[in-house]
Amino acid sequence: MVISINQVRQLYVAKALKANTAALTTAGDIVPKADTAKTTLYFQSMSPAGIVASDKINLKHVLYAKATPSEALAHKLVRYSVTLDADVSATPVAGQNYILRLAFRQYIGLSEEDQYFKYGEVIARSGMTASDFYKKMAISLAKNLENKTESTPLVNIYLISAAAASTDVPVTSATKESDLTATDYNQIIIEETEQPWVLGMMPQAFIPFTPQFLTITVDGEDRLWGVATVVTPTKTVPDGHLIADLEYFCMGARGDIYRGMGYPNIIKTTYLVDPGAVYDVLDIHYFYTGSNESVQKSEKTITLVAVDDGSHTAMNALIGAINTASGLTIATL
């Protein structure tokens, strides 16, 4: 979802669907309305300051209307599996210095050139097993990633054993080798983490990274010792923060133009989105066109968001009410 000043968007938080205007009593109540001939559609909703109405949409000018489920807006945390390259050596080569580098991009700034590097290091000894190697490398990486100035880790590190392939064993800077009791660890998982978010100030961010390998010497040749593979994500970050930021952004077109400047001498804006919830989204994209020199299409979007209970109940009810009132055939979720 792109939040841009180049697109005219009206946002309405639909907390409760109502049957008529008289039933609008609580902030977030909403009712879709149309004329008898079903040529125009508009919404009335209860804002924190009273009843408001949307644009009146000429139904012939609707370009599209599409619902997006909450899971489509959720962010899947990227996971890499790091293993020894069996084509080089499936077991650690004694005497070699194994170095794993994590290259973080867009760190602090948004440029790909804003890079930050962290390392894990293991010196292979005679008789070291692959399982022992993975333990040492995971612990080394976790300790080197520790930063007292960062409240949130840049990545999460896990070990996976052959006997429990679906179980993540977390490794932190406090983990000791004696805490890791399995003898069949066969990969290290490095997972993206959700970074701190502050409404309207710090967007929901994730720091992209790439595992990189330095070379070791095997049979007289310099070889990259490992393989990093992107694997199926197991964790997601829901869209609550994204929708909350969208509401904050859209409020800038409804009088909240100073964004808290002059605090504490300000009028606080009441927001309806719960950042801890998950939301389905409905976009109705349409245009206005006038006569004479105003015949060009002026495109707009009305966006309605509703809490997803896991079955899209609220959004599907809202879509049904819109279809009934207007004659549109918006697909439900």
From Swiss-Prot:
Its main location: virion. It is found in: Virion. The keyword Amino-acid biosynthesis does not apply. Keywords: Capsid decoration protein, Capsid protein, Virion. GO terms for cellular component: viral capsid, decoration. Auxiliary capsid protein that forms an outer layer on the major capsid protein protrusions. Interacts (via FD region) with the major capsid protein. The central region FD is structurally similar to Helicobacter pylori flagellar cap protein FliD. This is Auxiliary capsid protein. It comes from Bacteroides phage crAss001 (Bacteroides phage PhiCrAss001).
